[in-house]
């Protein structure tokens, strides 16, 4: 089933997201101050409805049997992407994703929920890396069935 969701295009595309922005967060205020030297536009430039596709459906459509690595960088929408893979996760060896702890992106989940979900599906966290200058970490999980 395809559904539509509002996508927010930011003035600097690396932060475009399906999630709402917390304009009162300390991180947003600091980021906006720095970006204002280069870009005088509003932070959210436009929004539009986007048809979502799930990884489960794309695996089927493309007739994929497995994936060595799934890299997810969706600015607060990572858990939705992972859940959208459903029963195809068992065919993915590594999952790499980032998680923001800075409160700028309003997410509908916490990191512990992703960790619990992947752990229940036989994934194990093998790497946690803090990104410089912000409260964001990258995580790599391995599928223990495919180790």
PLM segments and residue spans:
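Phosphate/nucleotide-binding beta-alpha loop and adjacent structural elements of enzyme active sites
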Residues: 1-147
């Amino acid at each position: 089933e395809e559904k539509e969701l509002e996508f927010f295009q930011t003035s600097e595309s690396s932060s475009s997201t399906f999630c709402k922005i917390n304009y009162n967060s300390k991180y947003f205020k600091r980021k906006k101050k720095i970006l204002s030297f280069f870009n005088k536009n509003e932070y959210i430039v436009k929004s539009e409805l986007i048809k979502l596709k799930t990884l489960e459906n794309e695996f089927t459509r493309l007739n994929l049997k497995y994936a060595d690595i799934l890299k997810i960088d969706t600015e607060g929408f990572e858990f939705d992407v992972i859940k959208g893979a459903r029963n195809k996760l068992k065919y993915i060896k590594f999952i790499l994703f980032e998680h923001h702890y800075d409160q700028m992106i309003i997410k509908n989940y916490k990191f512990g929920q992703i960790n619990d979900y992947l752990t229940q599906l036989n994934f194990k966290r093998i790497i946690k890396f803090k990104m410089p200058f912000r409260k964001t970490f990258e995580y790599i999980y391995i599928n223990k069935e495919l180790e």
